[in-house]
């Protein structure tokens, strides 16, 4: 790509102030320096400023997280549609957009699953984002409490569904 020791790859990681984000940014910068010889600068700021800058597109590489609001692939995939306000990286792929549009309009679960698989292949090929880690949720639940949802990807707990076992 034309990069070498005299002309290293240079870019900036943009993230909000938080200890975990800083550790991840430092680890990435170190690894990219070691593996690619990249000169990676770190830029951190307070949350409100970070959101404003990120939403205006004032970054080269940004830290962000995605949380599913519902248990369906579109909860993540829709955020990469070129017209989505959640597409802060401004990635655009017309074929991806068309596949997602088609998936949203089909009632056939098998067809929709196949369309999502095709969309995910495009993401894997173009890499508009780099998944770094998944934050695990660890819960300690008193065995006397019943109704606590075990398989709950959104981590929503409605207290009206909880009860004390006798």
Regions found by a protein language model. Give the residues of each.
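Append "and occasionally in soluble cytosolic enzymes with long acidic Gly/Pro-rich linkers
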Residues: 1-30, 34, 90-95, 118, ...
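Periplasmic binding protein-like
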Residues: 13, 33-81
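Bilobed periplasmic-binding protein-like "clamshell/Venus-flytrap" ligand-binding domains
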Residues: 1-20, 62-65, 107-143
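Extracytoplasmic/periplasmic, Sec-exported soluble proteins
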Residues: 16-24, 42, 46, 65, ...
């Amino acid at each position: 790509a034309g990069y070498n020791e005299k002309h290293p790859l240079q870019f900036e990681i943009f993230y909000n102030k938080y200890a975990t984000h800083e550790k991840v940014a430092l680890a990435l910068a170190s690894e990219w320096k070691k593996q690619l010889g990249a000169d990676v600068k770190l830029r951190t700021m307070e949350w409100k400023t970070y959101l404003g800058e990120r939403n205006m597109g004032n970054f080269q590489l940004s830290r962000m997280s995605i949380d599913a609001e519902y248990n369906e692939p579109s909860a993540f995939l829709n955020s990469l549609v070129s017209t989505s306000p959640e597409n802060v990286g401004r990635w655009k792929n017309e074929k991806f957009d068309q596949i997602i549009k088609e998936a949203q309009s089909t009632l056939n679960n098998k067809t929709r699953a196949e369309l999502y698989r095709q969309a995910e292949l495009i993401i894997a090929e173009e890499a508009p984002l780099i998944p770094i880690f998944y934050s695990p949720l660890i819960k300690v639940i008193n065995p006397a409490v019943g109704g606590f949802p075990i398989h709950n990807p959104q981590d929503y707990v409605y207290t009206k569904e909880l009860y004390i076992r006798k």
